[in-house]
Amino acid sequence: MHRAPSPTAEQPPGGGDSARRTLQPRLKPSARAMALPRTLGELQLYRVLQRANLLSYYETFIQQGGDDVQQLCEAGEEEFLEIMALVGMATKPLHVRRLQKALREWATNPGLFSQPVPAVPVSSIPLFKISETAGTRKGSMSNGHGSPGEKAGSARSFSPKSPLELGEKLSPLPGGPGAGDPRIWPGRSTPESDVGAGGEEEAGSPPFSPPAGGGVPEGTGAGGLAAGGTGGGPDRLEPEMVRMVVESVERIFRSFPRGDAGEVTSLLKLNKKLARSVGHIFEMDDNDSQKEEEIRKYSIIYGRFDSKRREGKQLSLHELTINEAAAQFCMRDNTLLLRRVELFSLSRQVARESTYLSSLKGSRLHPEELGGPPLKKLKQEVGEQSHPEIQQPPPGPESYVPPYRPSLEEDSASLSGESLDGHLQAVGSCPRLTPPPADLPLALPAHGLWSRHILQQTLMDEGLRLARLVSHDRVGRLSPCVPAKPPLAEFEEGLLDRCPAPGPHPALVEGRRSSVKVEAEASRQ
């Protein structure tokens, strides 16, 4: 029976192998020359794509500014499809499914993505808020699976509730009532997000006006950031925080490629509504005082004037920081007004760094700078427990006999310096278990002092118990004390409270008496 020749048989010998060999030199150099992660966001993106076996898209994501994995998790259906189209993955639904699966794993179990990246210099990855950006992400997303007959769009779509749910759970700094509302950031500049100006929520003028030279001031305020337009204190950043944001933006901007006029023209031609809303900014002179206000108005990420934010919902510190960073970036490069994905990623990086530096500086402040009265009062309470004989001198020998407390709970709750000092003096010369007030660190925050306070009480309680056990045999022979018959469980906490000098165990004394009585009765019988 004659067989039909296979398609490879008609090719010249080695033709298929040579064709496959010609493809290899094109792929291997790109894999070898692939840029390694330089920031925390790029490292997270690298690990997610590595988990999904989609590292070929890594450079495309970086070139498009998609170095924020949380942005992919928070994206809605339309935004996610747009991102997939930007990186060239929209025509490959299987790749999209693999990416969705990796994103779900990253959101639910970030520990799976802790494998090291080869040849990554440790000093090149800024470790700002790693535990917060990589270790506490929790949320639920739809599985993205559909029947084979469904269109490709449904296969790579998240549930409609995923942006709202993840906005509450994946916010990098959940502080304040308005933390993490992803509805306000529209991803790329969509027509809905760049509608004409106006509306009820008009941005106010910045409190820190720019200098007459027209340059970007270092202390530029954030009054025009909040779209709520209240102009009050809650919608403004502190000048020190603004200074940190400006310094971080300038440091990142030194290595940031600036856009050109050709890019602006092409982007404005692609989006007519965007051109009508922000096109006039590119025609304004740099010395124009209104240019900064317009840039702040249209560079806002959270709380835009055309967003559907709940009335009365204030912006959190994290959102205000992102808005200020976005304004600073756009004032240095106006083309970022047209590339909101990249602008959002850069602003988040600045917000993480600035918040970390602010919290680090706050932890090093002295108690007087953090709110003197509460910390001083707490420090005084700790000092009273460390030196009770100085703060409260005993009036006489009666002070060495603290009043009897009937229960263990009351004794533990009212463990004061007076009762502790009385017990220690009754036992004998015992080394002090707590350092003097001069040894206490003065730069601890309130929660640190409370932790030290609780730790000292625990150590004093444990040391007191050990001191009683050690001194029991030592002082038992000197002054035996035979009080009423207390339960055995109350001995350790109540024996020294009942007698001036500790004595032998009451249960042992009573046991000896009962044994003698039993022997006497037995001998009589």
Curated annotation (Swiss-Prot):
* Organism lineage string: Eukaryota, Metazoa, Chordata, Craniata, Vertebrata
Compartmental location: Nucleus
- Protein name per Swiss-Prot or TrEMBL: NGFI-A-binding protein 2
The tissues in which it is expressed are: Widely expressed at low levels. Highly expressed in melanoma cell lines.
Q: Which residues carry this modification: Phosphoserine?
A: 6, 157, 159, 162, 171, 479
**Chain spans, region Disordered:** 1-22, 135-237, 380-416, 502-525
Induction cue: By serum and phorbol myristate acetate (PMA) stimulation.
- Claim: Repressor is one of the keywords in the record: yes
- An individual GO BP term: myelination
As annotated, the Glycyl lysine isopeptide (Lys-Gly) (interchain with G-Cter in SUMO2) covalent link is placed at: 517
Give the gene that encodes this protein. Answer: NAB2
Q: Which organism is it from?
A: Homo sapiens (Human)
UniProt family annotation: Belongs to the NAB family.
